[in-house]
From Swiss-Prot:
Gene3D superfamilies: 3.30.230.10
Domain of life (superkingdom): Bacteria
Name of the featured protein: Ribonuclease P protein component
Name of the coding gene: rnpA
BP term (GO), one: tRNA 5'-leader removal
Reaction it catalyzes: Endonucleolytic cleavage of RNA, removing 5'-extranucleotides from tRNA precursor
Quaternary structure and partners: Consists of a catalytic RNA component (M1 or rnpB) and a protein subunit.
Length: 116
């Protein structure tokens, strides 16, 4: 995923947390903030050290980025998304992560159309 599609700065994360809306399930919390001036969506990831060592945390982040890469045409543009991974994600496979992420994105209304 290209760097322009990522949220990196703490100030940008804080803006999404404070001004955005949130939706959650057992595995993920997603914060969304509308950005009408931005033609694409951006994602920021937060994976706590409570989830495991660096290898586990990096794997979780790769899984989440891959889901967004595969679904980029179905996710609403002009938004910033911050995804916070919760503890159950540490033991999940890629397909379980994808299913859970799609569930919370659907709940949040972040998908252009309904995807199975």
């Amino acid at each position: 995923m290209k760097k322009k599609y990522r949220i990196k700065k703490n100030k940008e994360f804080q803006e999404v947390f404070q001004r955005g809306t949130s939706m959650a399930n057992r595995q993920f919390v997603i914060y969304m903030l509308d950005r009408p001036e931005q033609p694409y969506f951006r994602i920021g990831l937060s994976v706590s050290k409570k989830l495991g060592k660096a290898v586990v945390r990096n794997r979780i982040k790769r899984y989440i980025r891959q889901v967004f890469l595969e679904m980029k045409d179905d996710i609403m543009p002009q938004k910033d998304y911050v995804i916070i991974a919760r503890l159950p994600v540490a033991e999940m496979t890629y397909f379980e992560v994808k299913k859970s992420l799609l569930h919370v994105l659907r709940k949040a209304g972040a998908l252009k159309r309904d995807i199975k």
